[in-house]
Structures are given as C-alpha cells and as structure tokens.
Amino acid sequence: MKKLLSLILLLLLLTGCSVQQPLRYQQISQQDAKNLMDAYPDYVVLDVREQHEYDAGHIPGAVLLPLGSITKESAAAVIPTSTCPVMVYCRSGNRSKQAAEILCDLGYLNVMEFGGITTWPYEIE
C-alpha cells in the first residue's frame, strides 16, 4: 500500500512538472498577419533573419532586426513604444518564436508571431 501511494505521488509530481507555460505572445496565421498589415499600416513588422536573408527578399515594410542583435536599445530604435503592435517573422518560424519571447522579456506587450517567409503566400520585395 505504501509503495502504491508513493508511486501515485511520484506520478502526480512528474505530471505537474511537464505543464507548459502559456505563451506571452500571440501566434497568428499568415493570413491574419496580412490582414492586420493591410488594415493597420502603423504595425511594426519585424524580420529577425540576417541581413543577407533580408536582402534576398522580405515582406514589404518589414524592418530588419536580426535575432542575435535584439537588445533593449536596438528594439527601442525600431519599435516606438512598449504597447505598439509588433508582428515578428523569420525564415521558418524558429527564430521568430525566440525573438517574440525576447521582446516580451524586454517589456513589449503586444507581440505577435506568424512563422516564416518560406510559407508566406503574399508579395515580397
């Protein structure tokens, strides 16, 4: 009986450790991102790829801020306020998720992530 109780307690403890934390940013579809860009041109569209990737093609109006160079100062240079809506993308969606987390850590409150440009079905320049 003691062993069974210990096993149940251990299982409860382990399942409690695997609970995922909720995202602090919003994940949106690329269609929703495009609709927001069209409706609200003051949104900041942030490309977190490297310069050469950005130069090869980017979403019109996107501002380059490579993932590795995001700091409080560099973010403030391209995002006017902490409440300004920011939509983040990269090549495949990995770096954009990391960047969204960093921006939330820096105090940005309206961060959205919409994946990568490789699946972007709309215009690029």
Q: Where are the model-predicted features located?
A:
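Sec-dependent bacterial lipoprotein signal peptides
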Residues: 1-15
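Rhodanese-like catalytic fold shared by cysteine-dependent sulfurtransferases
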Residues: 4, 17-36, 43, 52-84, ...
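Intrinsic disorder/low-structure terminal segments
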Residues: 10-12, 39-42
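Short strand-turn motif at the edge of the Rossmann-like AdoMet-binding core
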Residues: 49
